[in-house]
Amino acid sequence: MTRIKRGYIARRRRTKIRLFASSFRGAHSRLTRTITQQKIRALVSAHRDRDRKKRDFRRLWITRINAVIRERGVSYSYSRLIHDLYKRQLLLNRKILAQIAISNRNCLYMISNEIIKEVDWKESTRII
């Protein structure tokens, strides 16, 4: 067998890892073994938090919509609004509704009033 020279390959791998961890504090940016452990941990946290961010924003949007809706009508809530939106087959997602609730509350009130009128009218004309 012939001899294989791979002198700089390991060094190149370690410098690449060190560049990733250059902003870490203490031994986490200096020692190779702890750098690799912290890199794995950082990537796991980033992957987990990308999913968590979606959940957190959805929760924030729901809270904002519910707060604005409950200000106007005492008996009307977020869950009834979303249910009535689906009944009327309106394509307004929670993100858009939350933006409308923050920027222009009157517009959200008009949307909810139209939905309530439409649903009440359909229920009152239904033949049993």
Curated annotation (Swiss-Prot):
GO biological process: ribosomal large subunit assembly; translation
Molecular function GO labels: rRNA binding; structural constituent of ribosome
NCBIfam families assigned to the protein according to its UniProt record, in alphabetical order: rplT_bact
Gene field: rpl20
Function noted in UniProt: Binds directly to 23S ribosomal RNA and is necessary for the in vitro assembly process of the 50S ribosomal subunit. It is not involved in the protein synthesizing functions of that subunit.
Name listed for the protein in its UniProt record: Large ribosomal subunit protein bL20c
Places the protein is found: Plastid, Chloroplast
Pfam family, one: Ribosomal_L20
Family as reported in the entry's similarity comment: Belongs to the bacterial ribosomal protein bL20 family.
GO CC terms in record: chloroplast; ribonucleoprotein complex; ribosome
UniProtKB keywords: Chloroplast, Plastid, Ribonucleoprotein, Ribosomal protein, RNA-binding, rRNA-binding
